[in-house]
């Protein structure tokens, strides 16, 4: 399970180091293979899955009938735009320029461990995310009983 926040540096070739704390987990879960795709819900963010978890997500998304525009858009953003990546000998992955450009990732990024996946945020989008607050209305009835 992935959790925590890590400041990431992206080099001129678009490579970033996966934090050492996660490398063994990624190696065991998916033989050093990850899948990168767009976060369909929030701008400035990419999702990064271990390949084994990605296969479950991909199959679930593609099992939905694409007769609705929202389903097609979800399939396009998640599956159609997915990039398969492999950790190199130094624990780095290369983020495609198309993905970096689309979400505004340049030299600095933030990696969030989100349980079954990572979120890779541009530094600016992450700063805006952290500055947002939640109200009781945002939580809704199902979350009001959380004990945080």
UniProtKB/Swiss-Prot annotation:
SpoVT-AbrB domain: residues covered: 5-53, 82-125
Designated name of the protein: Transcriptional regulator MraZ
Sorted UniProt keywords: Cytoplasm, DNA-binding, Repeat, Transcription, Transcription regulation
Pfam family, one: MraZ
Chief site of localization: cytoplasm
SUPFAM superfamilies per record: AbrB/MazE/MraZ-like
GO cellular component: cytoplasm; nucleoid
Species this chain originates from: Stenotrophomonas maltophilia (strain R551-3)
GO MF annotations in UniProt: DNA-binding transcription factor activity; transcription cis-regulatory region binding
PROSITE patterns: SPOVT_ABRB (PS51740)
CDD domains: MraZ_C, MraZ_N
Gene3D superfamilies reported for this sequence: Transcriptional regulator MraZ domain (3.40.1550.20)
Subunit-level organization: Forms oligomers.
The family this protein is said to belong to: Belongs to the MraZ family.
């Amino acid at each position: 399970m992935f959790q925590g926040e890590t400041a990431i540096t992206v080099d001129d070739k678009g490579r970033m180091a996966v934090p050492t704390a996660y490398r063994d987990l990624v190696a065991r879960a998916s033989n050093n293979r990850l899948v990168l795709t767009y976060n369909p819900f929030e701008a400035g963010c990419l999702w990064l899955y271990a390949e084994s978890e990605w296969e479950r997500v991909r199959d679930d998304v593609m099992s939905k009938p694409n007769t609705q525009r929202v389903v097609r858009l979800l399939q396009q953003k998640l599956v159609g735009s997915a990039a398969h990546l492999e950790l190199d000998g130094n624990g780095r992955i290369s983020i495609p320029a198309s993905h970096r450009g689309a979400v505004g990732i340049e030299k600095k990024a933030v990696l969030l461990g989100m349980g079954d996946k990572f979120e890779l945020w541009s530094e600016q989008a992450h700063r805006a995310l952290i500055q947002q607050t939640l109200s009781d209305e945002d939580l809704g009835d199902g979350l009001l009983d959380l004990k945080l």
